[in-house]
Regions:
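PP2C/PPM-type serine/threonine phosphatase catalytic domain
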Residues: 1-198
Length: 198
């Protein structure tokens, strides 16, 4: 089954009052895993896209049905690795990186106000790190009935010794890309992340 479907990894970072963000991220992760496993299309990219799209519907429906959860949402970055190929479906500002031959490359594009301002040349990357609007996400799962999902297949991307690294802005918002690169090179990624945050 693993060879046919690949390995699925999901990062979701919830937003919303009280515990709504936690609920949104949990619902998104559970839904992506369940729908991807069902795999109606038999195509990893199509199944992954459908899984994130369904997660949006589930989170949005719960937000509408439950006043305590009104307006909740979450980022959602879902990655499937099958053979040397990687499949990615992405909404928000959580990130996926590839560490290959000592170089780190961001595979996702942040859906945030400051990232858009950087892309438009209105802010530098250094200015974006301290901009008070850096937490404003322009796309998220569950906030509206429909969401635009970035989906991409990276064919023959992976080689022996490569590392795929995923994180929310809770990590990439605290440490520079160079530090993330060092973390991705650590023998124990979880120990490196703990050291970076503390």
């Amino acid at each position: 089954e693993r060879e046919r479907r690949g390995v699925l990894v999901v990062v979701a970072d919830g937003m919303g009052g009280s515990r709504a963000g936690e609920v949104a991220s949990r619902l998104a992760v559970e839904t992506v895993i369940r729908v991807y496993r069902e795999g109606a299309a038999g195509n990893p990219l199509a199944d992954l896209y459908r899984a994130v799209e369904t997660a949006n519907q589930v989170v949005h429906s719960e937000s509408v049905a439950n006043p305590e959860m009104s307006g909740m949402g979450t980022t959602c970055t879902a990655l499937v690795v099958r053979g040397g190929d990687a499949y990615l479906a992405h909404v928000g500002d959580s990130r996926a990186y590839l560490m290959q031959a000592g170089r780190m490359r961001q595979l996702t594009q942040d859906h945030s106000l400051v990232a858009q301002l950087v892309r438009d040349g209105q802010l530098s990357a250094d200015q974006a790190r301290s901009d008070p609007r850096r937490n404003v996400v322009t796309r998220s799962v569950g906030v509206s009935a429909h969401v635009e999902i970035d989906a991409q297949r990276f064919e023959a991307l992976l080689r022996e010794g490569d590392t795929l690294f995923m994180c929310s802005d809770g990590l990439h918002g605290l440490v520079q890309d160079e530090e993330l690169s060092d973390l991705a090179s650590e023998p124990s990624l979880s120990d490196g992340c703990k050291r970076a945050i503390v």
